[in-house]
Amino acid sequence: MAEVRAKLAPGIPIDVWCQDEMRVGQKNKLTYRWARKGSRPLAVHDQRTQSTYLFGAVCPELGTGAALVLPACNSEAMQLHLDEIATKVSPGAHAILLLDQAGWHGAKILKVPSNITLMPLPPRTPELNGQENIWQFMRQNWLSNRIFKSFDDIVDHCCYAWNTLIDQPWKIMSIARRDWTTMGHSM
């Protein structure tokens, strides 16, 4: 983060964002449920395969985020998401975007907006990315153990889940915050 700070004009605030994407579809994952001890709770499970991708990013310090529901997970979709994130960065601030090393995150065709710097996380370290915990929370609360009727139903549920989360900034702050990500504000 110090390298990014050195390249910016003095006094420009840095917002640290976490980015990731998840597949949501008819053949969805099962999650834990509350049930009486000794019982075996039932959960529906669909064998159809329609799905979509939810690209999401949050700024845990500010409790805000940016997301898109897209039909594919590739560099074109990543470009759309970067452009969306750029519109949500605080005015006059610069964003450091933490992300994993998926191929489309570092594609040469990406045109990274001027108010964003990409910062790849080390390989196989999902615990460093607060967005992973956001996905877990969304699955447990809104997106799992259900049958989606159609592709549009999947998209509607993704939008509902994200919009419900965004309306609760304290949840984003609580779930995705890492102590070391606040360094950008104090430098």
Which residues does each PLM region occupy?
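Extended, low-complexity cationic-aromatic segments
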Residues: 1-83, 177-187
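C-terminal anion-handling pockets and recognition modules
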Residues: 12-16, 131-187
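Short beta-strand segments
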Residues: 17-19, 95-99, 119-122, 174
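RNase H-like polynucleotidyl transferase catalytic core
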Residues: 39-48, 114-133, 147
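Short, aromatic/basic amphipathic alpha-helical patches
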Residues: 107-115
